Design a protein with these regions (language model features):
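Short, well-ordered beta-strand segments
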Residues: 45-47
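Catalytic core of pol beta-like nucleotidyltransferases
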Residues: 1-28, 34-40, 49-104
Length: 104
C-alpha cells in the first residue's frame, strides 16, 4: 500500500536536510515508518544527532518547517543528545540514516 507515503517521507527528508545542512549532524528515520510497519495515520519519527554545538533555535526551526509543510502526518523530532543512552543506541542500530555518518 502506497498512499503517497513515500512522497511525504521524501518531503520530510528534504525539509530536514535543508534546515540542518550547515551543521554537523546525522539525521535518522526511526520507528514504525523505518521498520516498514507504519499505518496510514502513523506519525513520522526522525532523530537528530549532533556532532558539534548547534544553535538553540535549530530544532524548533526544523519542527516549525515540518508543521508548515504539506505533510499530513505529525513529525516527531527527537534530539538524540537529550535522550536515554539505551534509546539512543537503539535508534542508531535500527534506524535508517538519512544523512551524516555514525560517530561514537
Amino acid at each position: 500500500m502506497n498512499d503517497g507515503t513515500d512522497a511525504y517521507l521524501r518531503q520530510v527528508r528534504e525539509i530536514a536536510l535543508r534546515v540542518l545542512a550547515p551543521y554537523p549532524v546525522t539525521v535518522y528515520l526511526f520507528g514504525s515508518r523505518a521498520a516498514g510497519g507504519g499505518r496510514r495515520l502513523s506519525d513520522v519519527d526522525i532523530a537528530v544527532e549532533s556532532h558539534g554545538a548547534l544553535p538553540r533555535h535549530l530544532l524548533p526551526e526544523l519542527r516549525e518547517a515540518l508543521e508548515e509543510s504539506t505533510v499530513p502526518y505529525h513529525v516527531d523530532v527527537v534530539d538524540l543528545g537529550a535522550v536515554d543512552p539505551d534509546f539512543r543506541e537503539r535508534v542508531r542500530k535500527e534506524a535508517i540514516i538519512w544523512s551524516g555518518s555514525r560517530i561514537g
